[in-house]
């Protein structure tokens, strides 16, 4: 099998054009990830022949693949900050022999999009399931790993840096604002007393001790909100989302649609009000689209997903 990867430097990111002339009917590669709300995304984008679409959170390429399957002349530009996700996506689409995907490595808020470039845009926010399932990335408290949580391995700020060096007040504010954690002050106080922490499991155990025993073993782990807050802070997720929401409507052709999947209220509120207040967009979904019970049963991680759509106004 012969792969061609042509790269061109683009400020601090890389544009990667992936092509493969062999095995066009290759079966699905083993690393392909099935995203949430598949049919709802495809229906909402209203994909057109010869359209150009932006997958702003490429990951393992699940949504991109669904878009490309709609018509043989559809093209997709995919964005991802995670170098490991990019590498796996390269392998996936090369094995499938699909030449219609371009990948731009970087933060979606920094993408230099052109006015009217895309027929549609999709963004699936947060951490993907494969990232959670790789222990050494440090996103999950269910695996012992270093306190990392970086999407971009080249940046210096890690979860360990925050936990072990921020002052108590700053930690409490972080847990409350980004994790909506009501016990934020008590948790911050305990962590400052017990630090330094080196691993995810060590940190999760310390957080759990801030809760009454009967609340430590419920459906939602006591450390969930703190870990969410740390991940958001490490990767500037909300700041990046706000910048993306400001830029993305300009990249749509008239009538083009943008859909965003969020997984917690901090993201969803920003998407909701950005769509509502935009002078360029008409809201399509008055209420968010949520997974059907069958999908939640097959994929429990989908249960908190909310999908909102808006459409670019005519000129």
UniProtKB/Swiss-Prot annotation:
Positions of S-adenosyl-L-methionine binding: 61-63, 80, 108, 124, 131
A biological process from GO: rRNA base methylation
Principal subcellular localization: cytoplasm
UniProt region (Disordered), positions on chain: 291-315
Pfam family, one: Methyltransf_5
Catalysis: reaction(s): cytidine(1402) in 16S rRNA + S-adenosyl-L-methionine = N(4)-methylcytidine(1402) in 16S rRNA + S-adenosyl-L-homocysteine + H(+)
Class of the enzyme per the UniProt entry, highest EC level: transferase
One GO CC term, this protein: cytoplasm
Subcellular location as annotated: Cytoplasm
Start-end of Basic residues biased regions: 301-315
UniProt superkingdom: Bacteria
EC number: 2.1.1.199
Keywords of the record: Cytoplasm, Methyltransferase, rRNA processing, S-adenosyl-L-methionine, Transferase
GO MF, any single term: rRNA (cytosine-N4-)-methyltransferase activity
PANTHER family from the UniProt entry: 12S RRNA N4-METHYLCYTIDINE METHYLTRANSFERASE, S-ADENOSYL-METHYLTRANSFERASE MRAW
Physiological role: Specifically methylates the N4 position of cytidine in position 1402 (C1402) of 16S rRNA.
NCBIfam families associated with the record: 16S rRNA (cytosine(1402)-N(4))-methyltransferase RsmH
UniProt family annotation: Belongs to the methyltransferase superfamily. RsmH family.
The name this protein goes by in its record: Ribosomal RNA small subunit methyltransferase H
Source species: Crocosphaera subtropica (strain ATCC 51142 / BH68) (Cyanothece sp. (strain ATCC 51142))
